[in-house]
């Protein structure tokens, strides 16, 4: 088992290095010059002052050295925990900007992923043994899982936010409030959070429900299920075994779909102007903030890889066949 986890850890480290390298390269191939943008913001008329300021910013951000040296400097700073300084919010460190945005993204992602996975699996399992639920879940589930996150977010904002007027459609809390621990502010947080969360939850819920429904039907027709029924085992016991076996592909599916759900969360934040990492990325692209883009993508890459590694560990714990295979391979 240790050898298995060592191989997995090495694979994830190589993936991390490759992803971070691509992340570092993309902003540098984007059109535009962020240093020129910062100099233009100063509105200087003296050519010597403009040249001096441009030289200062170029040296400050390390853009005056060869590209390979910039790459090595990036990794050196990364190992020190230094993500650089935001060009857009100069001189605020990128880390400080991310710390303000990450909690909003996690507040959307974690509940949406966990609740949609559990609720979708339970509902799909129930639909597999109920004709009425099956006729209801299947078409609705297909519609939900085929709906783009952005389109569903716009639809929810229009229907529940504009037409009905129940929920706000922009921001993380009311612009008239200051962040405090008061009930008024917390309620405003929840009201602004609900529509982005619902967009993520519904799309993911449909996919998990359909997947579990199909897996339960497949497992109930397997040889072991027929054998148990021929022995007179209660139908409830057969379904319990079928549910346990059907959960394994769903755990694998969670690892495979994690990147899609995270991408959906970033797009949803943009739709609702929700101040998470996704909305931050949009703003960083608009102002050509290389270092903020690098920091935001680094958080996403690291988060997805860590979550996938945890899911791998859970899969080994849940599936005894995996542990048996590891012992056999070791022997």
Language model: regions and residue ranges:
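Alpha-helical transmembrane segments of integral membrane proteins
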Residues: 2-3, 98, 102-134, 149, ...
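N-terminal signal-anchor/signal peptide hydrophobic helix marking the start
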Residues: 6-12
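Residue-level recognition of pore/gate-forming positions within transmembrane alpha-helices
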Residues: 12, 20, 117, 142, ...
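Hydrophobic alpha-helical transmembrane segments of membrane transport/permease proteins
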Residues: 16-69, 164-185
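Juxtamembrane/transmembrane-helix interface segments of polytopic membrane transporters
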Residues: 19, 23, 27, 32, ...
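Membrane-water interface segments at the C-terminal ends of transmembrane alpha-helices
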Residues: 23-29, 74-76, 140-171, 199-205
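Hydrophobic aliphatic residues
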Residues: 30, 38-42, 79, 87, ...
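Short membrane-interfacial helix/loop motifs at transmembrane-helix boundaries
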Residues: 56-96, 167
């Amino acid at each position: 088992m240790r050898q298995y986890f060592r191989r997995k850890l090495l694979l994830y480290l190589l993936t991390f290095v490759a992803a971070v390298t691509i992340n570092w390269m993309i902003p540098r191939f984007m059109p535009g010059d962020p240093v020129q943008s910062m100099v233009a913001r100063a509105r200087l008329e003296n050519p010597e002052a403009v040249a001096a300021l441009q030289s200062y910013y170029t040296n400050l951000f390390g853009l005056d050295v060869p590209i390979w040296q910039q790459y090595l400097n990036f990794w050196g700073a990364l190992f020190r925990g230094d993500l650089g300084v935001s060009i857009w919010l100069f001189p605020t460190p990128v880390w400080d900007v991310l710390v303000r945005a990450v909690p909003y993204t996690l507040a959307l992602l974690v509940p949406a992923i966990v609740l949609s996975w559990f609720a979708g699996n339970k509902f799909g399992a129930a639909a597999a043994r109920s004709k009425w639920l099956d006729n209801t879940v299947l078409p609705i589930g297909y519609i939900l899982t085929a709906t783009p996150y952005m389109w569903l977010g716009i639809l929810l904002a229009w229907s529940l936010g504009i037409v009905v007027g129940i929920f706000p459609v922009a921001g993380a809390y009311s612009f008239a409030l200051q962040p405090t621990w008061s009930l008024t502010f917390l309620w405003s947080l929840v009201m602004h959070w609900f529509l982005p969360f619902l967009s993520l939850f519904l799309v993911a819920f449909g996919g998990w429900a359909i997947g579990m429904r199909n897996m339960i039907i497949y497992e109930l027709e397997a040889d072991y299920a027929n054998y148990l029924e021929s022995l007179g085992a209660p139908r409830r016991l057969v379904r319990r075994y079928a549910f346990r076996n059907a959960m394994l592909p769903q755990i694998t599916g969670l690892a495979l779909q994690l990147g899609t759900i995270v991408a959906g969360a970033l797009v949803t934040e943009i739709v609702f102007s929700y101040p998470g990492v996704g909305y931050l990325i949009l703003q960083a692209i608009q102002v050509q903030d290389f270092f903020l883009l690098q920091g935001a993508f680094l958080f996403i890459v690291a988060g997805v890889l860590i979550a996938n590694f945890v899911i791998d560990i859970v899969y080994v714990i849940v599936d005894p066949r995996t542990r048996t295979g590891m012992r056999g391979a070791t022997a």
